Amino acid sequence: MYHTHMHESLISVTSTVSVSDASYAYARLTRRDDSDSSSSSASSTKNSKSAECTGSKQQCQLPTDSSHSTSVTVGVAVAVPVGVIIIVLAVILCIVYRRSKKEAEEDNDPDFEGDSEFLPTMKDYSPGINHLYSSDSQQDFMEKTLQQPPSDPFVGSMHSSKYNVRSATPPAIGRSWYVDPFQLPQESNDSNSLRDFAMRVQEDGLGGYKVAAESRNASQTSLHPDNFSNCTPIRASSRFQESESFRSHGSPIHNNQLSRGSATEGANKQFTFPNEDNDSSSVSEEAEVLNESNESASNDAFEFELDNSSEKTHERNLRFGKDDDNYELQDIREAEHMNDRSSSKSQDDDYYVSLLSPNEEEDIKRMKSIYQVYLDRAKTMKKEEDKADNANDISQEENRVDNIVQNPLPSIKINNNDNIDNNEVPEAKHLVKEALPLNNTNLAEYGPEMAQSQKQYPVQDTLTVNDTEAAPSNRIASSIYSEAIQPLNYQDQYQQQEQSPVYNGHTQYPGNGYSGNPQQQGYTAQFVQNPQWYGVPTPQQQQHNHPQTLETIGELPTPAYLAQSASSHSLTSFKRPNKQQLLQLQTARLNGTALNPVDHPEMFYSPTNDAYYAPQQQGQYMKFNENGAVPSPYQLRQSVVMTNPSDLTAKPSYKPAGSFRSVSATNSRNNSLTTQNNIYLQQQQQQLYNSRVSGILEETDVVQPPSVGGILPHSGSQDDLRKQLGSSHNYTVN
């Protein structure tokens, strides 16, 4: 039984061990399967990756840094635009450099005549001719002489004389001078000046174009004796004279300028070769015509002075090279060469003088009138004719002065010992007037000039008349300020002494000057004192010696210094009326019965300068004549109605910009004396002040109270300024 039990326990142990071994083996098998599956999956993945890459290891290996592609992209995006911009700028700079270089070469071009001239290009010249005088705009001289001989280039040109000198060439040799004036410039290797281009105009039917084109040529070929003295003929060399086409086209050369026409040549030949085989009648006619032309040439409006350079003292050779043939044009001044020139003259050269047509004469007169107004240099230059005219004028003035000295006008003698103060007018003392008889001569025999002179220098009332001093010592009547102070005597009754001269018992100066028989113009001045009594001082009681003695009016200060200034000044001086006014005048102003000078000018201002009106106490006005006296400053002021504007019209009220209402007529007169002394109007204004137009604007913001005289005082100290600013309408106004 024990053996059986042991056997059963052994079997159970064995079974237990076997179960544990089986579980362990299963776990190992399971773990092995997992490792095999993982290894197989890894190998399969590796195999799949290795299957995708078909290159070398370096090719299949991915780069560790991926910024390579980014840098390439950024570099291309930046470098390409920058390179394109640099290339474009280089092209532009190259073009600008070439253009500037070309302009610099054109600026240094000797053919350049100026910015105001248009230089057209003409046809090409002959290849063998070298133009040596392109800088003087004369490079086409040989072309005109050799290729295109001018048959009649100056037809209708404005010459100084009445006649025109022309050269007639046979049709076989010369051809017509015809060029289209509206010809467009053509492309060429060389360019001519505007003067040469404008000279080539059509002969007929151009009108103003012809006048404008040939004005310069006409001025250079004017028939003036001075021009002929500065001209010398040209003798060509033997080879130059052999050609038949060159015989009749020699032209003169000025001292410093080549002539472009044959008109001057014809004139020179007329003066240089008087011994030609011509009829006596034709010679005499030509001489008469030339004399007339010389006389008329002195008044030439188109005459220009030809500059005489230093080349006048030596000979100048002009050479035009063409291969081996050198044509020489020598400026020779010996008489023997002039004889050779006259002997070599061709029979085909027939020079004559012809009259101008009426149209040409009319054009000449028109151009002369325009030239004399705008371009005449004679007005700014001294000439012998002007000296002669001045001498004649001086002689006439001397004769006139002699006549005046024989009959001297009354002059003014001023006492230099007068005590003149800067601000005060000295009181007049008892001045003794001496009645000096004037020369009782008949002024009519010296004509109206003497009478006019006597009118311009009348006798002064309060000044001593002297018949020994010269007339120019008088003061001109148009002067506002007189040289001497007219003495006045201020008394309680405003007594004024006025001396009116009596001339032979009647008045000699009735307003406009002399009247009646001129035989009565001789007179003897006698001064009689006529004291007049006034209730109101006359305006002439304010006399000043000189403008400097008046009040100094300062310039308007800048706004920055306006606060520190004592008062606000302007260039216009406003002065309040004097407080010492008569009660009657104040009453008349308050009642509105004072006369307005604008409404009644005849009561205050006389139609002439020799009378004025003075107000009286009874309201009447009396006229007092100052016969023959120089107008006083107050009379000159009255002649232009220099009246204080505040005395003529009522002062307007202050109306700021942007007002919401229209000020009534009563409020527009709030600063006048009538409004200030009228209780009814003041009550109306007070009602308007208290009433509100709207909730935005107050009446006191629009209308200035009557008690406020002005915005700022025009004179006074800083205290006055503060007082004025403190009494504004924004505060309580009494």
Swiss-Prot record:
InterPro entries: Immunoregulatory_rcpt-like, SKG6/TOS2-like. GO terms for cellular component: cell periphery; cellular bud neck; cellular bud tip; incipient cellular bud site; membrane. It is a single-pass membrane protein. Residues 309-327 have a biased composition (Basic and acidic residues). It is found in: Membrane. The modification Phosphothreonine is found at residues 169, 221. The modification Phosphoserine is found at residues 137, 191, 193, 219, 222, 251, 369, 672, 717. Phosphorylated by CDC28. Keywords: Membrane, Phosphoprotein, Transmembrane, Transmembrane helix. Residues 30-68, 239-327, 647-671, 707-734 are annotated as: Disordered. One of its GO terms (biological process) is negative regulation of mitotic cytokinesis. Its main location: membrane. Residues 53-68, 253-273, 661-671, 725-734 have a biased composition (Polar residues). The chain crosses the membrane at residues 72-96. Disulfide bonds: none annotated. Residues 37-51, 280-299 have a biased composition (Low complexity). It comes from the Eukaryota. Belongs to the SKG6/TOS2 family. Interacts with ZDS1 and ZDS2. Present with 1550 molecules/cell in log phase SD medium. May be involved in the polarity establishment process. Suppresses the lethality of KEX2-GAS1 double null mutant when overexpressed. This is Protein SKG6. It comes from Saccharomyces cerevisiae (strain ATCC 204508 / S288c) (Baker's yeast). The gene is SKG6.
